[in-house]
Amino acid sequence: MIKIGVIIGTTRPTRKGPLVANWLMEKINKLDIKNTEFVLLDIQKEDLPFLMDPKSPADGDYELASTKKWSKKIDELDGFIFITAEYNNGPAAPLKNAIDTIYREWDRKPVAFVGYGTYGATRAVEQLVDITAKIGMAPLSKTFVGISKFWDAVDEDGNIKEEYVNGNVEKLVDNLLWWAKALKDKK
């Protein structure tokens, strides 16, 4: 069984990450994938204070209960989809904090990206590709899905209009699962 974490990377009260996550999960559920579980993680609901654990995350010797809880959740997963907005040409600080709070739990795991914003969060994703590669993850930018002109991309009922979606969710998931299986088998 492959377990994929779908992480909503924003925490603002007016954020649209949950809307994008629901859209993504609906698309994934239609794919009818066997032997795979997709786990939705919303960092707004996680207790992740900004780098408050007194020791370096590289050691994995966490003191805070919140860090231990986050570590366990991430450690149990085989790959990730980061859902990110773009704030001032980069990813939201809470997502970066969620990455930086722990370390070894991300190692040798693939990560795909779904971005939303004026330009589909391309600049935020570019930075996340670099960040995740530096901590030993396998970033999969080739199958990135971006939702551009986001304020126009959502209709009055809160649905995402497909004409604003760049990329293909099925290809993203297929690529992510290939890497998750390959890397899990090598651990």
Annotate the PLM regions.
Residues 1-84, 90-97, 101, 156-187:
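N-terminal beta1-alpha1-beta2 submodule of the flavodoxin-like/Rossmannoid cofactor-binding fold
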Residues 88-89, 120:
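Glycine-rich nucleotide phosphate-binding loop and flanking beta-alpha elements
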Residues 107-149, 163-167:
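Short, glycine-/small-residue-rich phosphate/pyrophosphate-handling segment
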Residues 8-10, 115, 151:
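Short, histidine-centered active-site or binding-site loop motifs used for metal coordination
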Residues 149-157:
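Internal, active-site/partner-interface "lid" segment
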Residues 84-85, 110:
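Short, proline-centered helix/strand-breaking motifs
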